[in-house]
Amino acid sequence: MFCLRQLSPRKHHISFLLVLLLSLWLVEPLLAGPAIMPLSQVKPGMKGIGKSVFAGQSIQEFNVEIIGILENVQPKQNWILARLTGQGLENTGVVAGMSGSPVYIDGKIVGSVSFSYAFSKEAIAGITPIEEMLAIGGQKVPPRTGVSQPVNWLNMPATLEQLGSAYLNWSQQVGETASYDRSLVPIKVPLVFSGFSTRAFNSFKSILAGDNFQPVLGSRMAAGQTLNLSIPPPPAISEGQAVGVQLMGGDLDLTAVGTVTYVDGEKILAFGHSFYNLGTVDYGLTRAEILTVVPSLESSFKLATTGELIGRISQDRTTGVLGEIGRYPRYVPVNIEIQDNLIRKKQFKLKVVNDPILTPALLNAGLSTLIGAEERSYGNLSLDFEASFVLERGQIVHLEDLFSGNFDNPTTSLSSLVAAVSYLLNNNEFQPVKISQIDLKIRSVEEIRQASLEKVLLDKYAVAPGELVTARVYFRTFNNEVKTEEVEFTVPPLPAGSEVELVVAEAAYMQQLERSLYRVQDFTPRNIDQLLRLLSNLRKNNRIYFKLLASRPGLFLKGEEWPDVPPGYKAMLTSPRAATANLTEIDRSTLSEYQLPVPYVFKGAITVPIKIKK
């Protein structure tokens, strides 16, 4: 038989606290944000309000009338179709920058204004249901590592310039955008380019903007953020407020502007559709101020300025973005020095988001813009540079080269090269790599510095093994001056009567020669260390390369030449049982190599035979 027993005052107090804590835990999700109206309760004909900023930072209301429900417009996704009025929307239509504007019925949040029709005569919008946006916060996804499949455009590049060109051609193909007809599409997001020249803006807006964006040449707030790491306490954020998603900061700024849909403590939901739809990300979250709404037949848009950094965007999903106030992104700092005479130097600082896809594109746009602003965009130009990529684990990839030509070719070559190296590091197939810092020193002159090989003369053409030979190289500069350089080398100990060849050439010719020697068309690194060596050792434009070749069998394995392989070891490697991948038997081996720096982009190739005395 059960009987009641009176609890002691202490036990009664503990039990009461447990019940209270359990109750608070159960109701906490309901108290975290505004009340929600589920999609099942939304009916055609219902009327409500939306919130957005149309001028300044003041949140204003507009009218919303539900037209109907569009079910399964995308897998497991529904949209609410609505007509918007008020705040001039009858004349402007749905405005780019309204993405994320929250919609309320009977004081309960329904979702966010996210989609529209191009060239529509009325402000007809698609609303993303709030339940689908809230699902973003529940996704537990690890950060994107950048480890990916081998890059198919890296086909044994001969020079740094060719590597940059390969990336540029690939990125332009990737950047091609689709066209929309009469479908309901994401509302365009104003992407504000601050500090960019008109020419740079026109060059990069299609690559960086894509389908979901409205590129705008704008500016930051007068008291905008700096690169100072002492960030002030984050201010409060409200539903309907304008915010920015910052991709680049510093002397140039690239920030997209949208609207906050939902606030839950220090977390926010915004946009109601994807940004780039890259999943787990690390973008900046900033304040934004709307200057005005610019009416347009194609797509009216909010003209905005961006403000201080207040947090970060951590998720970029189909139904919106998730932001965290008070937590800040890990940017990649880029330090740039441009020198155009003996004493005049200018320093620039950028910070770009750390992303496998966006970082290279942002570096390309930022460097091209800064160099183009400081130096001539057209006419003769030569850029001599050094670049260092400092990695998180202490490794450094060092690049140096010279690009020379006219129009904007040198600038394009340099910026695309830095972008290419960033892409290869961030998207290597071996292990995650984080770039801690990029330092770039550029020296420019407004003239062409190119030279063509004329002839190569030796002090002797028949030599004894181990004898010293002097080679004099004659080349003609762009100004028709003939220059000479001398190099000394020692002939290896070879059998009497044999012959060696001295190849004097530019970088690109050396690649062609080695492809024919090794009978390979491409070379893919096998580990991260090999990739770092490949990038640091790529041949340069401003070098004269010397290679001594002899008819001596060897092996080419995993990107390296193995001369004088013992017969037994060679037989083991080349046997059918070994089946060693990427192994090539070669009949001519490299005895020695030299490179001579010159202040010109060097072109040409000559092969000189040398006899070994009996």
PLM feature spans:
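Bacterial N-terminal signal peptides
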Residues: 15-29
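Terminal presequence/propeptide segments associated with secretion/organelle targeting
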Residues: 31-614
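Compositionally biased, intrinsically disordered low-complexity segments enriched
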Residues: 8, 14-15, 33
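Short linear motifs in intrinsically disordered/low-complexity regions
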Residues: 13-14, 107
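N-terminal secretory signal peptides that target proteins for export/translocation
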Residues: 1-11
